[in-house]
Amino acid sequence: MTTRCPWVGEQSIYIDYHDKEWGKPEFDSQKLFEKICLEGQQAGLSWITVLKKRESYREAFHQFDPKKIAKMTALDIDACMQNSGLIRHRAKLEAIVKNAKAYLAMEKCGENFSDFIWSFVNHKPIVNDVPDLRSVPTKTEVSKALSKALKKRGFVFIGETTCYAFMQSMGLVDDHLNDCPCKTS
């Protein structure tokens, strides 16, 4: 690849993330759940910080299996607070457990998480015209609606900006620059 989106920089972990994951449509409910939880961990930080800790999160949070996470106790969160591989912010760590419970409540009511998430973009990616980084929004009416709907279902740490970053990363919107080789044609 020659011209990537300029936010990628030179770190190989970020280059791989950009080239192989970011903006690629993902429909697997558990992967979407993992990502929305990780996006919540980013609040106030840079994504690279979370990306470098992603494997530690997977280990600490049972590969993001909502059923196992929902059973985690305050003692489990105490252990997470001692784990240097995680962002040691109690409310953010507790949010993963709360979000697992909300996810399971949706499932119990017959709501498929992937179908729910993708319904906000009519089940197909929105490909935006992105001539430069200045034209990329940080939130949209759709991300506001998604945030509101998730909060109504009990999710936390999922504001409208976090939801937009989630939508970008999971391919609900394609915000690759127009001249980026990863841009949907």
UniProtKB/Swiss-Prot annotation:
Assigned EC number: 3.2.2.20
Domain of life: Bacteria
GO BP: any one term: base-excision repair
Keyword Hydrolase: yes
InterPro entries: Adenine_glyco (IPR005019), DNA-3mA_glycosylase (IPR052891), DNA_glycosylase (IPR011257), Tag (IPR004597)
Pfam families in the cross-refs: Adenine_glyco
Organism: Haemophilus influenzae (strain ATCC 51907 / DSM 11121 / KW20 / Rd)
UniProtKB keywords: DNA damage, DNA repair, Hydrolase, Metal-binding, Zinc
Catalyzed reaction equations: Hydrolysis of alkylated DNA, releasing 3-methyladenine
Described purpose of this protein according to its UniProt entry: Hydrolysis of the deoxyribose N-glycosidic bond to excise 3-methyladenine from the damaged DNA polymer formed by alkylation lesions.
Keyword Calcium in annotation: no
GO molecular function: DNA-3-methyladenine glycosylase activity; metal ion binding
Broad EC category: hydrolase
Listed name of the protein: DNA-3-methyladenine glycosylase
Binding site for Zn(2+): C5, D19, H176, C180
